[in-house]
């Protein structure tokens, strides 16, 4: 059991490394783009698919390893079931909270974009005409 736990920990660390590397590479190689617009160049980015495939494979390996853990029989099954139900409820709450935060952040992005547009217009109008 300890070997499986170590293996699981190693796989999770590997997945975290993949995600960190993906973010770093994509951040370093992503071309500049306008607010609110997605360019064709970004949609055609080949690294996205490569990193997504690596992360998906790591997630599948973790899932397979977790499924291989033995389930203890007896009264603990009911406890595990109860804990899973509670965790599902907590997860739903967190998802709802996250959805709210995403909505708030999208609203704030809109405000920032409007302010940037105002700043740009002000700067353009304050320049002397040639």
UniProtKB/Swiss-Prot annotation:
Give the matching InterPro entries. Answer: Med7/Med21-like, Mediator_Med21
The GO terms this record gives for MF are: transcription coregulator activity
Statement: the UniProt record of this protein carries the keyword Transcription: yes
Gene3D superfamilies documented for this protein: Mediator complex, subunit Med21
**GO cellular component terms listed in the entry, alphabetical order:** mediator complex
Q: Where in the cell is it found?
A: Nucleus
A single GO BP: regulation of transcription by RNA polymerase II
Q: Which residues form a coiled coil?
A: 71-99
* Keywords, sorted A to Z: Activator, Coiled coil, Nucleus, Transcription, Transcription regulation
Name the SUPFAM superfamilies for this protein.
Answer: Mediator hinge subcomplex-like
In the UniProt record, does the keyword Coiled coil occur?
yes
What is the documented function of this protein?
Component of the Mediator complex, a coactivator involved in the regulated transcription of nearly all RNA polymerase II-dependent genes. Mediator functions as a bridge to convey information from gene-specific regulatory proteins to the basal RNA polymerase II transcription machinery. Mediator is recruited to promoters by direct interactions with regulatory proteins and serves as a scaffold for the assembly of a functional preinitiation complex with RNA polymerase II and the general transcription factors.
Q: Which family does it belong to?
A: Belongs to the Mediator complex subunit 21 family.
PANTHER family attached to this UniProt entry: MEDIATOR OF RNA POLYMERASE II TRANSCRIPTION SUBUNIT 21, RNA POLYMERASE II HOLOENZYME COMPONENT SRB7
Subunit (UniProt) = Component of the Mediator complex. Interacts with let49/mdt-7.
This protein is called Mediator of RNA polymerase II transcription subunit 21
UniProt lineage? Eukaryota, Metazoa, Ecdysozoa, Nematoda, Chromadorea
């Amino acid at each position: 059991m300890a070997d499986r736990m170590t293996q699981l920990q190693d796989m999770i660390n590997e997945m975290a490394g993949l995600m960190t590397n993906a973010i770093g590479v994509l951040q370093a190689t992503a071309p500049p783009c306008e607010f609110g617009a997605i360019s064709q160049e970004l949609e055609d980015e080949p690294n996205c698919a490569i990193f997504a495939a690596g992360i998906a494979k790591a997630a599948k390996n973790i899932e397979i390893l977790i499924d291989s853990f033995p389930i203890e029989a007896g009264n603990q099954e009911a406890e595990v079931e109860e804990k899973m139900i509670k965790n599902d409820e907590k997860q739903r709450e967190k998802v709802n909270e996250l959805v709210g935060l995403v909505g708030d952040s999208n609203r704030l992005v809109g405000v920032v974009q409007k302010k940037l547009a105002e700043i740009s217009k002000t700067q353009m109008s304050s320049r002397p005409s040639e």
